[in-house]
Regions:
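Short hydrophobic/aromatic segments of transmembrane alpha-helices and their interfaces
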Residues: 7-8, 50
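A generic structural signal for well-ordered alpha-helical surface patches
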Residues: 27, 31, 51, 55-58, ...
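Short helix-capping/linker turns of helical repeat alpha-solenoids
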Residues: 1, 5-6, 14, 19-23, ...
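Short coil/linker segments at helix-helix boundaries
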Residues: 35-57
Length: 81
C-alpha cells in the first residue's frame, strides 16, 4: 500500500499487525508519519506528525527493532516546522 501511495490503508494494516506484536509493522507505521520518509516518498496531501512517528518508532524499539533507534535519532535531529 505504501508503494502505491495509499497511506491511510497502509496505516490501518500496520496498526493491525502491531497489535499482533510486529516490530516491523510498528517501524513501518512510524515511517508513515515521518516527514523525511513522506518527503522521499513524494506523498502529497499527507500530514507528517513527528510525535506519532516517534511513538511508533519507540513501540518498534520495544518490540525488538534495531532500526527503530536509528530512526528515533534521525527524527530527533529533524528541524520542527
Amino acid at each position: 500500500m505504501l508503494k502505491l501511495g495509499d497511506i491511510a490503508t497502509a496505516r490501518l494494516l500496520f496498526r493491525r499487525a502491531v497489535l499482533a506484536g510486529s516490530a516491523e509493522a510498528a517501524l513501518d507505521l512510524g515511517m508513515t508519519y515521518d516527514p523525511l520518509f513522506l518527503r522521499q516518498l513524494g506523498a502529497n496531501g499527507v500530514d507528517a506528525d513527528m510525535n506519532s512517528a516517534h511513538k511508533w518508532y519507540q513501540r518498534a524499539h520495544e518490540l525488538g527493532s534495531s532500526e527503530a533507534s536509528r530512526r528515533i535519532e534521525r527524527l530527533a535531529s529533524t528541524p520542527r516546522p
